[in-house]
Amino acid sequence: MKDKLIPEIINRKSSLTFSDEKITIDEIQILIESIKWAPSSRNMQPWKVIFVSKESTSYKSLFNSLSESNQEWASNCTLYAVFCVEDDKRLNKKFLDVGYAGQNLMLQSERLKIDTHPMGGWDEDKVKKSLKIPNENHVVFILAMGKKGSPDKLNVNLKERHDKERTRNPNEENFSFDIWKFN
């Protein structure tokens, strides 16, 4: 069944290694376009995305805002995409829309041969301060991005994670028909 899926879904993997090769402005424009076309409740398009390149003065402070486990590998990426939404009563729908936008970005990145790794670990206050994000906004997730790097540069633990086969749960663990049938 897997062979029926588009290759970007199958090939996308959370990379732990990136090369020094820059993502071009033309590639970033294509990625922005992919985000714009994400599904969105009532076409609100609530996402605010800040791209931070390695050359940016904000790069180091953003990196220092990440959790230790993310800092272990994320220093090699050449671009971060920081997804935010404004806080209000529709926050749940906005988070869902940001998820769609992020998935579009990751799949389009895969098509462009840009590796990605979504992160959920950071210090919210530090990220907001380093990128001047207003307090009434939430950082939903941060995506590390870059061209494919060499796994030979990884330490033993990261190399093991990098080489680990991507697996998925058996269908019965996550899917049922008609009624709840999960343990």
Where are these regions (language model features)?
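Acidic, surface-exposed loops and disordered segments
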Residues: 1-183
